């Protein structure tokens, strides 16, 4: 299951993302965050990635937002 989810994100990175200008507010891009979260937390990583995408908007804080060791939908405070 992990490989399928990661393949979907890689498809996005290769074919969809290049069409749009870079807009991620974080140092680890949202798509790379999603891949690493899936690798670390399985399907819960998808939820973490979606929560991260919802946090990525022009009015959010920028900077590092590393993947937490434990499942959480909140921004990792260690990254600030």
Swiss-Prot record:
Residues 62-80 have a biased composition (Basic and acidic residues). Disulfide bonds: none annotated. One of its GO terms (cellular component) is plasma membrane. InterPro entries: Membr_insert_effic_factor_YidD (IPR002696). Its main location: membrane. It is found in: Cell membrane. It is a peripheral membrane protein. It holds the Pfam family YidD. NCBIfam families: membrane protein insertion efficiency factor YidD. Belongs to the UPF0161 family. Could be involved in insertion of integral membrane proteins into the membrane. This is Putative membrane protein insertion efficiency factor. It comes from Streptococcus pneumoniae (strain CGSP14).
């Amino acid at each position: 299951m992990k490989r399928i989810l990661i393949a979907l994100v890689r498809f996005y990175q290769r074919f969809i993302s290049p069409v749009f200008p870079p807009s991620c507010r974080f140092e680890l891009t949202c798509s790379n965050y999603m891949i690493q979260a899936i690798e670390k937390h399985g399907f819960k990583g998808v939820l973490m990635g979606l929560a991260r995408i919802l946090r990525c908007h022009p009015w959010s804080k920028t900077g590092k937002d590393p993947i937490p060791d434990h499942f959480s939908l909140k921004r990792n405070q260690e990254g600030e």
